[in-house]
From Swiss-Prot:
A lipid is attached at G2 (N-myristoyl glycine). Pfam families: BAALC_N. It comes from Sus scrofa (Pig). Disulfide bonds: none annotated. Expressed in the brain. Residues 27-120 are annotated as: Disordered. Residues 83-106 have a biased composition (Polar residues). It comes from the Eukaryota. This is Brain and acute leukemia cytoplasmic protein.
Length: 145
């Protein structure tokens, strides 16, 4: 995996507050595309007009980052991260479009969390007596709490 963690560690991350759907999709995209291409269908690779895992027809990966393939099947050297949130020091190139997108996502989540906490309080009044009814809709007992 590159950072020494297992796939189970990635599914249940240690840093819950930083794990978002964006992080999960980024992790899944990059780890799935790191796998070497299978030799079962040699004429379905990118050189023969086929598609690479995680890459759409127009050469853009599933998360919107443009990708290119060099001759020989090597992947783009500008890949931002290869191991998700499991590395203690994420390998990022700084002020790329992916970093800016994540910062925008964090501010959106903060606004969304603020809306959740500012919900109206609801008071529920419970009646003091509970009536038990049988199948014939007759009151059988009258209990007082």
């Amino acid at each position: 995996m590159g950072c020494g963690g297992s796939r189970a560690d990635a599914i249940e991350p240690r840093y819950y507050e930083s794990w978002t759907r964006e992080t999960e999709s980024t992790w899944l995209t990059y780890t799935d595309s790191d796998a070497p291409p299978s030799n079962a269908a040699p004429d379905s690779g990118p050189e023969a007009g086929g598609l690479q895992a995680g890459v759409l027809e127009d050469g853009v990966s599933a998360n919107g980052v443009p990708r290119s393939t060099a001759p020989g099947g090597t992947s783009n050297p500008e890949k931002k991260m290869s191991c998700g949130t499991q590395c203690p020091n994420p390998q990022s190139l700084g002020s790329g479009p992916l970093t800016q997108k994540q910062n925008g996502l964090r501010t959106t989540e903060a606004k969304r969390d603020a809306k959740r906490t500012s919900a109206k309080e609801v008071t529920i009044n419970v009646t003091e007596s509970i009536r038990q009814v049988d199948r014939n809709q007759r009151i059988t007992k009258k209990c007082i709490n």
